[in-house]
Amino acid sequence: MPVLIRGDSNMIVMPLSYSASAIARSFEVIEEITIAEKRYLIIFDKKTPRASIVKAELEDVGGELRHVAVAMLELNNQKSIGDNVISVERFWEDSSVLQVEGVCVDRRYQELGFATQLYEALVIKCGVILMSDNTQYEGGKALWQKIAKSSNALSVFILDSDAGLFFPYDGTKAIYDGISIPEEKIWSVHPDVEHFGIVLIAEDKRRIETLTFSNE
């Protein structure tokens, strides 16, 4: 993710919708949330993989009752990282690692924190590790910084995927709080690809606190 591309992502913006049968067939409902007195379902397709937040109440879409999506996450299963092809099992033996390839939120709902809700639900409810992409738009950068600064559920770390080391790259692992590490050490601005190998990692904060306590 650390090559920052100025401007907005070219990802297609919703609306997207799913039939109730499609959700039952392909997705697991991992959480139900209520925001602004409206109910939403967080759904996860582990096989593809992909995740979405959809309205719990069915709506008429082209004459068919469907669950309308308000946010979606495109993901990719990661078995290795970096130019040196380091196995992710070196860092996480008992967790799946999913790389975030794209996140999209309906513009009408962008102030409601749905992207953060998606990240937190996947890590906490499904036990996965989330990894940023190696290229990123400003919106993605802002989202990772927001999660690092404000999330009560997730801890964020900076990983040099080529060297196989976490910041500060001395064998330890420092939590990033959104401001504690200078931006120029994480992101290089396109066309500069100096930090292409740097990725951000989101893990379950409870697990990190448990490991820290056990090592004291």
Stretch-by-stretch model annotation:
Residues Q117:
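P-loop NTPase Walker A phosphate-binding motif
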Residues M1-Q110, E120-M131, E138-E216:
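Non-catalytic substrate-recognition and accessory regions of acyl/acetyltransferase enzymes
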